[in-house]
Amino acid sequence: SLYAPSAVVISKTQGASADAPAQRAVTLRCLPVGGDHPAPEKACAALREAGGDPAALPRYVEDTGRVCTREYRPVTVSVQGVWDGRRIDHAQTFSNSCELEKQTASVYAF
């Protein structure tokens, strides 16, 4: 096959809109695991556990005890591509980067 069954582009944008220019973006390929994501095995495992649904990621994260400030500096993440042959086009905004990291673990850690 020309295309991996699960390959996505994950991006981060400062602000509350996924339409703003991305500050960072990485590729993540699963089966075979690869891309330029810094922890592709962990990110693929988290997405697999969430059934390929990025919106379901927060419920799978363990409580690390990390405390975040209440500052509002929104960060928007987006995931676009294909997961198990299904098209993914997801965007989600977090109140700040600490909340993003606390709630989503390895997928957006880049």
From Swiss-Prot:
User: Per its database record, what is this protein's job?
Assistant: Strong inhibitor of subtilisin BPN'.
Please tell me the species this chain comes from.
Answer: Streptomyces cacaoi
> What keywords tag this UniProt record?
Disulfide bond, Protease inhibitor, Secreted, Serine protease inhibitor
Cite the SUPFAM superfamilies for this sequence.
Subtilisin inhibitor (SSF55399)
Entry-linked InterPro entries = Prot_inh_I16_SSI, Prot_inh_SSI_I16_CS, Subtilisin_inhibitor, Subtilisin_inhibitor-like_sf
Q: Does this entry carry the keyword Disulfide bond? A: yes
Question: One MF term from GO for this chain?
Answer: serine-type endopeptidase inhibitor activity
Q: Which family does it belong to?
A: Belongs to the protease inhibitor I16 (SSI) family.
Q: Does the record's keyword annotation contain Secreted?
A: yes
GO CC annotation, single: extracellular region
**How does the record describe its quaternary structure?**
Homodimer.
Protein name as annotated: Subtilisin inhibitor-like protein 1
Write out the annotated subcellular location: Secreted
Pinpoint the site Reactive bond. 70-71
Disulfide bridge partners, by residue number = 30-44, 68-98
Where is this protein chiefly located? secreted
Output the superkingdom of the source species. Answer: Bacteria
